């Protein structure tokens, strides 16, 4: 649970089970975000200068959710948008996850976060929820329990991440 403190900092308190769960989830997220060698870079000069990324949306629905098309009605514009933005966006997501992992690796029962670290946590938790929601086929908050074949442990984790994100938003505001 996140709580605000005087001076703009926040505290995070977790029990051992929460700590273990979050460490595992952030490790999986880091693995998901590892950038594969892209064969889809359209501009050879951009590839040589490491200036551009893939022009194709990922076949993995979770990655497609994290890196959606910029223009749903213009395939060419969407490819250009992806080529020039995905690498930077991916780096930001990796950095946010790394901040959360660092917080957990230095765990002593309670942690104090700066505003910048809290923003990284917010990004990382949001991305975890997007990935898990995609894997569980949750399309909006109203249908969380609509699929009788849903993984109930996955739903519990999704709800926990939602709660944790909510406490962080409350602490930030």
Model-derived segments and spans:
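Extended, compositionally biased non-globular segments
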Residues: 102-106, 111-114
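Surface-exposed helix/loop patches within compact recognition domains
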Residues: 94-97
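Charged, alpha-helix-forming regions
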Residues: 1-89, 99, 109, 120, ...
